Design a protein with these regions (language model features):
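Short, Lys/Arg-enriched N-terminal segments with co-localized hydrophobic residues
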Residues: 1-12
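Bacterial N-terminal signal peptides that target proteins for export
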Residues: 11-21
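Bacterial N-terminal signal peptides
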Residues: 20-30
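Sec-dependent signal peptide cleavage junction
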Residues: 30-40
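Terminal domain-start segments
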Residues: 38-93
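Exposed beta-strand-loop-beta-strand "reactive/processing" segments of non-cytosolic proteins
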Residues: 70-127, 187, 192-202
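A short, surface-exposed interaction/processing loop segment used at functional sites
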Residues: 119-189, 203-247
């Protein structure tokens, strides 16, 4: 009889522990959802909710080989659109800007944490071998390019970087409160490093610094800033024309 009571007690305790674990999981998931909802990053611009996640997750062993002591934060991995000069379009229309982005190339920036610093993996899809490249590449190099075409690969590993872009955006969530989408773009005239663009359903509203130095932003008086590191789309557009020719 004592044994039976003891067993029932064990079962009851296990059930309690299961319930507690379930509650912790539910609150963690709910907390993550609220955390993600605080900034308007679309599912297609977050790695773990994108169509690229399955393939890129297979690179984890390679990442750990390059940075064995790193804690990789896939939850904060974001898409950066490249080869898309939004400034040259000379428009603030959200539909026109997003249409240009949809046809642009992009990379994924995956942050990681070391003991005392941050780092980033840049993951890009291999491009087809171009005819003009054949004259400057060896046969072996040409074969390597062909083998990587269409496949995701780590193209850069950087240490001692700025904090994760996601964290920077989270710090600027009040400035993004009127925006319905924020995207990261690179190689803009006067803003070569990645920068964030906040848009509402109708128009582009703000540019947000991601911790780099941008010649365009350095020319804007502090009195015209929305807040530190946040600039109106118009104020950047007014002086960015001088950088368009240099970017071509």
């Amino acid at each position: 009889m004592k044994y039976s009571i003891h067993k029932r007690g064990e079962i009851a305790m296990k059930n309690i522990l299961k319930i507690m674990l379930m509650m912790i999981t539910i609150f963690t998931i709910a907390g993550s959802a609220v955390y993600a909802a605080e900034i308007p990053v679309s599912d297609q611009d977050q790695l773990i909710t994108s169509r690229d996640w399955t393939e890129i997750s297979n690179l984890q062993d390679e990442m750990k080989k390059e940075e064995p002591d790193a804690t990789i934060d896939y939850d904060k991995a974001l898409k950066v659109y490249v080869d898309c000069n939004l400034i040259k379009l000379q428009t603030a229309d959200t539909k026109k800007l997003t249409s240009a982005l949809e046809s642009a190339n992009y990379v994924w920036v995956i942050p990681f944490k070391m003991e005392k610093t941050y780092g980033m993996f840049t993951v890009a899809k291999g491009l087809p071998l171009r005819e003009e490249a054949k004259s400057v590449l060896t046969k072996a190099e040409q074969e390597e390019v062909k083998n990587h075409a269409g496949k995701w690969m780590i193209t850069e590993t950087a240490e001692h970087t700025v904090e994760p872009y996601y964290d920077i955006l989270l710090e600027k969530r009040e400035a993004l409160s009127d925006c319905t989408r924020v995207v990261l773009v690179g190689s803009q005239p006067g803003m070569r490093q990645p920068v964030a663009l906040g848009m509402d359903d109708e128009t582009a509203r703000i540019w947000i610094s991601l911790g780099y130095q941008y010649p365009v932003m350095e020319k804007i008086p502090e009195t015209q800033n929305v807040e530190s590191g946040v600039y109106s789309f118009e104020s950047v557009a007014e002086i960015s024309d001088t950088y368009i020719e240099d970017s071509e």
